[in-house]
Amino acid sequence: MTHSPFPSWPDTAADLIAVATGRMAADMLIRGGKWVNVHTREVLDGYDVAIIRGRIACVVPDATNCTGPDTHMIRANGRYMIPGLCDGHMHIESGMLTPAEFARAVIPHGTTSMFTDPHEIANVLGLEGVRMMHDEALMQPVNIFTQMPSCAPSAPGLETTGFEITAADVADAMAWPGIVGLGEMMNFPGVSNADPKMLAEIAATQRAGKTVGGHYASPDLGPAFAGYIAGGPADDHEGTCEADAIARMRQGMRSMIRLGSAWYDVESQITAITEKGLDPRNMILCTDDCHSGTLVNDGHMNRVVRHAIECGCDPLVALQMATINTATHFGLEREIGSITPGRRADIILTSDLRTLPIETVIARGQVVAEDGHCLVECPHFDWPAAARQTVHMGKTLGPDDFTINAPKGANAVTANVIGVVENQAPTKALKFELPVTEGRVQATGDVAQIALVERHRATGSVTNAFVSGFGYQGRMAMASTVAHDSHHMIVVGTDADDMARAANRLGEVGGGIVLFKDGVELALVELPIAGLMSDRPAAEVAAKADKMMQAMRDCGCTLNNAYMQHSLLALVVIPELRISDLGLVDVRTFEFIPVIESPT
């Protein structure tokens, strides 16, 4: 796979100087706009931007001396000129789309730079899968920078994955052209305890002069937190409250605050800026996980910036947190993040800084979107058959695979139950007394059964437990091969027969999400690439995802973006309780605990 590197500043310097001094005509001139300067936090009226070879030559009050007969003139007509938006931490796979289709979906929303960690595909296809994502990313008309995944598996010994990423893999990847750093270091106990593999990955990244991504998903801000920071991670997006954001920034980390499809962590943390008055340079906006429905219906980073403003943030500060702060964090402030000479010409025209309508999007000096419509091609990688055949179940499953037996003679049991928390990634460790019928524990009330079906090595293994918070009613089951981060198959349901039907259906189609109610399939989203992504257009995938969300509501679920909650129930690095293919995990202690506590 080859790609054409974007011309560097040194390669274009002579032309940039010639245009800036009026000795050469610009390729493009944006005329008469309000220049939003994120370096000085100013809005300067009546400025022109001259562009040559995809880079900004000058930003001046009058650039008519830079024009020629072939100059593409864009009249801003007093609109604001803001830098293209940057997503500081995200997973493309969460959109259920390939990099090409993800780019096509977000370009009209003004996202021109993404810092993506493809650790989802790393767990399924290993280093080869990461390279496929990296290569398709480099083919796009916007900037998709890749962070080499650090933790596959996310927690060694607590789960098994399709592949493992090694320290040697990380060292090798640092030489790839699109790699800007190390993906989120999720094994935070490993870092705090100086695990040699984790430190080797961090060292390889630091020696390459690149950024180490963080993931500290614990409320403990004591010695474990201090040890984690001392290990080298430079940012963190797992904070959920003001104290988390302040603690990270005080220790020299960037606090990344996220608004994803189901993670609403901006409002609770941005008060560190808006109320406590801390310097906003060390705070960055990001999405982490957005599914296709959110991208198509609500937006991407424009949605996050608007939300920050609605939470009381000054619009110029919010824009800094989605542009120059992000670029600076990754050492790319001389490439992206501002409308200043030499930088890539990634520019948005908008008529309002608060509501942020994205009217024109320019990326690398090319108009890529107008009024919500993508105007450019987003080339596709030729995904091989091996990437499309990743669901290996080993056998056809039946209802007996989805039962939990009670201790002999028990009429009821006390069960450890995963408690879903709306709009947040952490869960609660709950206990419920559940009845026993004919020797089998029954899920009652708001408690449903959850199972993890092994799908990488065809073992036929099924691990069962209980979950609460979805509000499902009647006989139903939902299955998904998107099961962060091991990406086996999660099945949640109230009926063993429907759970078996749902699991087997995903085996037939090669991965995705499916929901059965009373034995009937209500919705299906096919995700044939690694069981995680579709290479169909975002609108098509979003329509199927919307149908899935409606099917969940029809089964009694009222959670906001419940699918995202569903997909994270196996992520054994975010407290408190999670399920893995090896058992029920208490992430507070990183130990397995029994599903059934004791007979009563």
Curated annotation (Swiss-Prot):
User: Can you supply a Gene Ontology BP term from the record?
Assistant: adenine catabolic process
Q: Does the keyword Hydrolase apply?
A: yes
Top-rank lineage group of the source organism: Bacteria
* Keyword list, A-Z: Hydrolase, Manganese
Q: Which GO terms describe its molecular function?
A: adenine deaminase activity
| InterPro entries named in the record | Adenine_deam, Adenine_deam_C, Amidohydro-rel, Metal-dep_hydrolase_composite, Metal_Hydrolase
Reactions performed catalytically: adenine + H2O + H(+) = hypoxanthine + NH4(+)
Q: What's its EC? A: 3.5.4.2
Note whether Ribosomal protein occurs among the keywords.
no
Pfam families recorded for this chain?
A: Adenine_deam_C, Amidohydro_1
Q: Which cofactor does it need?
A: Mn(2+)
NCBIfam families per the UniProt record, alphabetical? ade
Q: Which HAMAP family match?
A: Adenine_deamin (MF_01518)
Similarity section: Belongs to the metallo-dependent hydrolases superfamily. Adenine deaminase family.
Protein known as: Adenine deaminase
Query: Where is the organism placed in the taxonomic lineage, from the top?
Result: Bacteria, Pseudomonadati, Pseudomonadota, Alphaproteobacteria, Rhodobacterales
Which gene specifies this protein's sequence?
Answer: ade
